[in-house]
Amino acid sequence: NRMDVAQQINALKEALADNWSVTVFPEGTTTDGKSLLPFKSSMLSVLEPPPPGVLVQPVVLDYGEVSEFIGWIGEEDGLNNAMRVMARKGSFRLRITYLEPFSPEEYHGRKAIAAKAREEIEEELGATLDEPLRDFRHTVEAIRYFAPDPKTGES
């Protein structure tokens, strides 16, 4: 809800004022590793105006071949995702690529900052995959609810 977002933004402002590094995941979730969702820029309003000396450093997290398994995709809740991933046998590789930091002062507003970061991440991810990113389509089948028959109790 909007109050939670405001509280999170205030916490980010306090952290930046205390010279802490902060991490924001602007997709808000994970994908299959072969696509990139639109960035939600609300948390980047902490950079309006940018605190002195603050830089934005885009980062790519690449789980390689297990991206679809690791990803939190669809209607799975957080606990079930964590249990599924932790129950997996063996190990998996995570490649972290730190891209060139940029000054948010060079961009006008949170949406422009988010667009710049997304552009950099998209370019790196595309180069890693050796193919263009595909459109991510989150589809959930409709579930129909039928009220039980009051006489029989059956749906």
Language model feature labels by segment:
Residues 20, 32-111, 132-143:
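A cross-family acyltransferase "interaction/gating" segment
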Residues 116-120, 124-155:
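Cytosolic-facing loops and C-terminal tails of multi-pass membrane proteins
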Residues 11, 15, 46-49:
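Catalytic-core regions built around general acid/base machinery
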